[in-house]
Amino acid sequence: MTTKRVNTATNKIMTLNTFLDTCFLLFISILFYLSIPIYPNKVVVVPQGSLKKVFFSLKDQGVDINALDLLLLRLMGMPKKGYIDMGDGALRKGDFLVRLIKAKVAYKSVTLIPGETRYFFTQILSETYQLETSDLNQAYESIAPRLNSAVIEDGVIWPDTYHLPLGEDAFKIMQTLIGQSMKKHEALSKQWLGYYHKEEWFEKIILASIVQKEAANIEEMPLIASVIFNRLKKGMPLQMDGALNYQEFSHAKVTKERIKTDNTPYNTYKFKGLPKNPVGSVSLEAIRAVVFPKKTNFLYFVKMPDKKHAFSATYKEHLKNINLSNNHF
């Protein structure tokens, strides 16, 4: 009887040892498996949907993933949706699975330079974030501020470098860009004017956008602004080429034919006053030039051979400067 009890106890111990050995071997095997290097793309796309859908999507992207990984993910948790940054080079399989669940969403940077138009910036956004320009334009028009019930076509998005997550839709991208930009507009207006009034502020942005397009450098900006104010005060048409560099014409040379045929409010040769919308994005310096313009009696300016402008108070002086300019070009 005693021998039988001893044998039973021995069998239980042996069974337990076998079980523990098996668990240990399984543990070591999993550790070894999780340490195997894989070479995923720098950015992988995790779709919305079931874990099975995620699994097959990763396989389609060339990720070395199998049924065991699917089982491990079921135990670890649901991967994040979106574009996941996996970094550069090799990753251990375990690190890859953890990044699927906990890693930061991948970002890309995009820059709007002062003077550029929304037309071209939208194309850059489209190429960078793989979005349709039509969707981006529709999103902009639904979010952007309005003047007299009409969307402000340009000059709203602040020129800057933006770091935006991949995988966001057009509405979210525009919501971020316009939201951040409007905070800057309001803050700057309150800093320089002591208050923010949308209509008054964006009239200054319209002025600044022409200054931005016309000035050869930052130093000229207050002088260009003074010419604009002086001509407006006298009821003179602005007659500025830069106002015609709107939207898709941002980089187009303004010709006599263009001045003759363009019938939009941007044509300050045909229409007195300011255009209804900013011509493009504006820098801090251009806005400052409009808020704090230089006091001059200048009414004219012309580009000289050194690419800078010669300013004059009378048409007679202006003609002399034009002759000097023509003789050197």
Model regions: which residues?
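Hydrophobic membrane-insertion alpha-helices, especially the h-region
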Residues: 17-34
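N-terminal Lys/Arg-rich, disordered targeting/topogenic segments
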Residues: 1-14
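Signal peptide-directed extracytoplasmic domains
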Residues: 27, 36-187
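Bacterial extracytoplasmic/cell-wall-associated proteins, especially those involved in peptidoglycan
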Residues: 127-131, 144-329
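Hydrophobic, aromatic-rich alpha-helical transmembrane segments
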Residues: 14-18, 318
